[in-house]
Design a protein with these regions (language model features):
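Catalytic machinery of carbohydrate-active enzymes
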Residues: 1-150
Length: 150
């Protein structure tokens, strides 16, 4: 959301997600709600828009329940997925709730933090996320389609 006061810290270049889509076994789904989905310059073959099916937080929870893991910045979705026990990869986390000395969260045992080394520099955390997904994708076979009842 470009109008958010902390947008610089929360907006990740979409092409970094496209790189993740190239990992064998990885399928990307967007939970972004609102008219700005067209900002995503990744082809529909690489990312599926679930945001158009989401009308409330219950729908969001149902969509998250269908995912193997969630990659998000510090938003309500990070807290929802963490509370649901879903693995969460959080690439930027300087907020006090995320501490500074660990890659985990005392509140959400399934959450793993991938920290930037420099403000606004996303390549390092996404390289680490990519490495983590490579390991995870060899352990799990994914279905072709994700469907939930919204």
């Amino acid at each position: 959301n470009p109008k958010h006061k902390n947008d610089l810290n929360r907006s990740i270049p979409f092409d970094l997600f496209g790189d993740l889509a190239k990992i064998s076994g990885v399928k990307l789904y967007s939970l972004k709600v609102g008219p700005d989905f067209d900002q995503i310059k990744i082809s529909p073959n690489e990312i599926k828009n679930l945001g158009s099916q989401i009308t409330d937080f219950q729908d969001t929870a149902e969509a998250v329940s269908c995912l193997d893991l969630v990659i998000t910045v510090d938003t309500s979705i990070a807290h929802l997925a963490g509370a649901m026990g879903k693995p969460v990869l959080l690439p930027f986390a300087p907020d006090w709730r995320w501490m500074l000395e660990s890659d985990g969260s005392p509140w959400y045992q399934s959450m793993r933090l991938f920290r930037q080394q420099q403000l606004g520099e996303w390549s390092y955390p996404f390289q680490r996320i990519s490495e983590a997904l490579e390991v995870l994708s060899t352990k799990k076979q994914c279905n072709d389609e994700l469907k939930f009842n919204a």
